[in-house]
Amino acid sequence: VSAKMILDSEAKLLDLYDWVIQPILSTTGAPVTDPLHDAEALARAPDGSFVVGFEKFHRIWRYPPPPLTDHSLPVPVSIPAEVQNAPSNGGLEGIAIFSDGRLLALTEEFQNPDGSFKGWLTQGERFFELSYLPSEDFRVTDCAALSHGDVIVLERRYVPFGILSVRLKLVRGET
């Protein structure tokens, strides 16, 4: 998706126009439309590239920065082999990229024995496993890295009959 912005004198968004909406491309150049391509997470890297996390067949792809984003093939990002053991629809749910390029990946339902959920901090080919414990009955929906190293995690809780709760949790960088 791309569009041009109209901003006011204080740089506040007033309108969007000249929208272009098209499917993202797979590593083969085909549009990503198949149910096995369940894009769940999106983060922008310091170099302007976009990183997309997928469930079902768990993987992360990096797309080049604009203006090439819409027309380029993604490059697979290395992830720990253990991610493939995540539940089909409970894998990579939140991705955040820090200013130094490290990538944080949190899972939605890939549980540890203590009830926390698996996550990883990656730097190139190095993976550091970590645990994330959401608020009671909540699950990770997405996350974002802040410039000073903290992370904001968006959590959601869904109860049948349409009751949805969401919350933001601040995770300090030193934890």
For each feature predicted by the language model, list its residue ranges.
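Sequence/structural signature of beta-propeller domains
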Residues: 1-175
